[in-house]
């Protein structure tokens, strides 16, 4: 008998976008903890409902057993995949493992000093030292979907649906 194992490296935003995974692993979303702001805006609620509706359309079941909180401190001891709406809770911002590329409307890109392809063969400080730093700002709406491994459980994922304004939330719901 031949058994096949199926593995996927998480977090993978493609499988989230296409199938709602890892949240859709349990069709009723019983392994999901949604973290929302204390006073969510209409756009944040629309983003949440759009995300849950999309996952439900993949599983064929409504999200009847998910947990929801507006207290970011409650996520530390939960054995659940986290879905963050609106902003990253401060309890996650302090984690050194999380490399967030989006902070409000700014992000940065590093370009190494080394300009040839041998960095993987002969790694040195030039391969890691930035030659330039580019700040990216926007006066228009911004939205981001980011994913990372949960800092509380290496078998769990976090997906954050972030927007800086009501128009940013529209970008998320129309994506």
Residue ranges of model-derived segments:
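Solvent-exposed alpha-helical segments and adjacent loops
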Residues: 1-175
């Amino acid at each position: 008998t031949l058994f096949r194992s199926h593995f996927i490296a998480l977090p993978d935003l493609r499988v989230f976008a296409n199938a709602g995974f890892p949240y859709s692993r349990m069709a009723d979303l019983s392994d999901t903890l949604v973290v929302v702001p204390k006073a969510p805006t209409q756009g944040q609620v629309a983003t949440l409902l759009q995300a849950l509706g999309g996952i439900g359309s993949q599983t064929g079941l409504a999200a009847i057993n998910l947990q929801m909180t507006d207290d970011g401190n409650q996520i530390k001891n939960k054995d659940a995949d986290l879905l963050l709406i609106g902003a990253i809770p401060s309890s996650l911002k302090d984690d050194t493992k999380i490399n967030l590329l989006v902070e409000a409307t700014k992000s940065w890109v590093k370009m190494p000093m080394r300009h040839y392809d041998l960095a993987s063969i002969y790694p040195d400080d030039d391969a890691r030292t930035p030659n330039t730093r580019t700040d990216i700002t926007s006066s228009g709406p911004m939205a981001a979907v980011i994913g990372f491994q949960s800092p509380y459980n290496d078998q769990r994922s976090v997906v954050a649906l972030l927007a800086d304004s009501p128009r940013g939330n529209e970008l998320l719901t129309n994506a």
